[in-house]
UniProtKB/Swiss-Prot annotation:
InterPro entries hit by this protein: C-CAP_CF_C-like, CAP/MinC_C, CARP_motif, TBCC1, Tubulin-bd_cofactor_C_dom
UniProt keyword Cytoplasm, yes or no: yes
Primary localisation category: cytoplasm
Origin organism lineage: Eukaryota, Metazoa, Chordata, Craniata, Vertebrata
Protein name: TBCC domain-containing protein 1
Positions with biased composition (Polar residues): 559-582
Domain called C-CAP/cofactor C-like: residue spans: 305-451
Localization, UniProt: Cytoplasm, Cytoskeleton, Microtubule organizing center, Centrosome; Cytoplasm, Cytoskeleton, Spindle pole
Job description of the protein: May play a role in the regulation of centrosome and Golgi apparatus positioning.
Length: 582
């Protein structure tokens, strides 16, 4: 029987993409979800699929959520669904045709979700629930720090934003093990509950209920590397008997099924810790002298199933790293403690997390699900993404193209939101493969996720003024046809660019009409170059320019080298991580 020993673990994707890295609403407790589970089974239009109209009624009328928040969770759950790129592009096209709120509501009402899986998804939000008791462990009592009652809750919420458990596979396993009875209770039919709402001892789970658990659980059998959703894993008759399956009723004994899962549950073998310990190491980054820790880049893409493919980039410092490798296609990327770096990942990606990065620029290919920025400082991010989430970050600038409202969590300060402003030759092809369109684009309509019961901090962000807007040029030669930013710029930004271009043309004409002699031209050229070098140093652009060059080129000649011979960058070998797209 050892041949059929099952190993079941929590899937990474619902925790990584589905769980919002913030304290959930108090109405997502088991008390209210138990009521919702009974309610949806007795109302038309709620079971087995729950439409937006009924969820809005439940969320706003029963759970007292704001409509924007209700749609946020509904939309986030939809990001987890395995829809094709064509389906997502069709949905984006339909939304872009909505010109009034009534038309938008009508379109949203066409969206529905699996009811049981959505219940599990809502319960899963408890992963990042703050415990007042645990948040105070380790502090002296009385605390030497004065903390006003009004700020304490927001500080704790900002802390959970920066220390969320979305990547922590041990936390995922502990959560499932601890809350397994309640998770299964949400799947039990109302007729198997007592008058007080408690699960009866001889309760059963339908095959459909077990199938819904595949949102959270997957696994394999011993001596096999093939990973299956949990309901397909149980298609083996030997495992069915262990899990309490009855052929007569075509259902599982709840108690026996729970015992089976408790024995089978184990740590996800494709988590971030295993990736860094036993994954393949990539020599993409330079080891820069003067840095305390070595840059580390690992991947598990050679062995992990879809949704669990990871690339970890840690301590990438003081360099430019540019890649459009197939190793990045549809992977989850985590950038940890990168500083003073310029990173270009120009491939279609699955999700991206920036954690504790500072003084860096990150340019991404289209991200199918979410980009999450947490505990970062002075970081510039340029991305096309299904969702953008920012928490606990300071002085960051984000240029985005996104069909959903950017989600601003507690703890942010001095954020700047600007329109997407770059291109590379294969960008539009990558967007199509990721199911991301140019419209709708809600980059300038952020949703502030505040502490429950208090007003969100509307002063934590600003929309970039057109006078500060400059397009970003990706400094690499790549094959492809596209040479334009895929989305049109807002009118005021476009006018600002045209005005600036006109000023440059007028300045060039003034220089031409001055009729300088040869000595005057040399003097004028020297002055312009001097001012240019001063500007490079003042703005920090000199560091980026230097990092584009091979180590054999001295930084002192970087500006001249770049302006006189751009093709040199393309001639570097694929082993050279700086200044070339490999």
């Amino acid at each position: 029987m050892d041949k059929y020993t099952a190993y079941v673990w929590p899937r990474l994707e619902p925790f990584l993409v589905g769980v919002l890295p913030a304290t959930p609403p108090s109405k997502f407790s088991m008390h209210y979800l138990r009521k919702m589970a009974s309610y949806v089974r007795t109302r038309d239009g709620c079971f087995p699929r729950l439409g937006w109209q009924m969820w809005r009624h439940i969320a706003c009328g029963k759970l007292q959520l704001a409509e924007d928040l209700a749609w946020l969770y509904f939309e986030t759950f939809d990001l987890l669904m395995p829809r094709s790129a064509e389906q997502r592009l069709e949905w984006a096209e339909a939304l872009s045709q909505c010109h009034t709120q009534k038309e938008l509501d009508r379109q949203r009402c066409k969206l529905s979700v699996d009811t049981l899986q959505f219940l599990l998804f809502l319960y899963l939000q408890q992963l990042n629930r703050i415990s007042l008791r645990t948040s105070l462990i380790g502090e002296e009592w009385p605390s030497p720090r004065s903390r006003s009652p009004s700020s304490s809750s927001s500080e704790r919420d900002a802390k959970i934003s920066s220390q969320n458990k979305n990547w922590d596979v041990q936390a995922h396993l502990t959560f499932i093990q601890t809350h397994l009875p309640e998770l299964l209770e949400l799947l039990v039919e109302p007729g198997q509950l007592s008058s007080s709402g408690q699960v009866l001892r001889d309760s059963h789970l339908t095959s459909e209920a077990v199938e819904s658990l595949s949102l959270l659980l997957e696994g394999s059998v011993s001596h096999s590397r093939t990973v299956h959703p949990v309901h397909k894993l149980l298609s083996r008759s030997q495992l069915q008997s262990q899990a309490g399956f009855s052929k007569l009723s075509c259902s599982y004994s709840l108690q026996q099924f729970q015992d089976f899962l408790r024995q089978a549950l184990c740590l996800n073998p494709f988590g971030i810790s295993n990736c860094s310990q036993s994954g393949k190491k990539l020599s993409w980054a330079l080891q820069v002298e003067g840095t305390l820790k070595k840059a580390k880049i690992f991947r598990n893409t050679h062995a992990a199933p879809p949704g669990s493919r990871l690339v970890l980039m840690s301590q990438v410092c003081k360099q430019t790293l540019a890649k459009d490798s197939e190793k990045l296609n549809d992977v989850n990327i985590k950038l940890h403690r990168c500083s003073e770096a310029f990173i270009y990942l120009l491939s279609p990606l699955w999700s991206v997390t920036l954690d504790k990065c500072r003084n860096s620029t990150l340019v991404l290919g289209p991200v199918r699900t979410s980009v999450h920025i947490q505990s970062c400082e002075n970081v510039r991010v340029v991305c096309v993404a299904g969702r953008l989430t920012i928490g606990g970050s300071f002085n960051c600038t984000i240029h985005s193209l996104t069909p959903t409202r950017p989600l601003l969590l507690p703890g942010n300060a001095s954020l700047t939101l600007g329109p997407f402003h770059t291109q590379y030759p294969t960008l539009e092809d990558h967007m199509a493969s990721a199911g991301l369109a140019v419209v709708p684009n809600l980059w300038n309509q952020p949703l502030l996720f505040g502490v429950e019961g208090s007003a969100p901090d509307t002063g934590c962000y600003r929309i970039q003024p057109p006078s500060e807007f400059y397009p970003l040029v990706i400094p690499f030669q790549m094959d492809g046809d596209n040479c334009e930013i895929p989305c049109s710029l807002p009118e005021d930004f476009q006018k600002a660019l045209e005005s600036r271009e006109k000023t440059i043309e007028e300045w060039q004409k003034t220089v031409k009409d001055a009729h300088l002699n040869k000595a005057q031209r040399r003097q004028f050229q020297a002055l312009v170059e001097q001012k240019f070098h001063e500007w490079l140093l003042e703005t920090g652009q000199r560091q980026e320019l230097d990092s584009l060059l091979p180590p054999t080129i001295t930084p002192s000649s970087s500006a001249e080298h770049w302006s006189s011979n751009q093709n040199t960058l393309k001639e570097q070998t694929h082993e050279q991580p700086t200044g070339t797209v490999c």
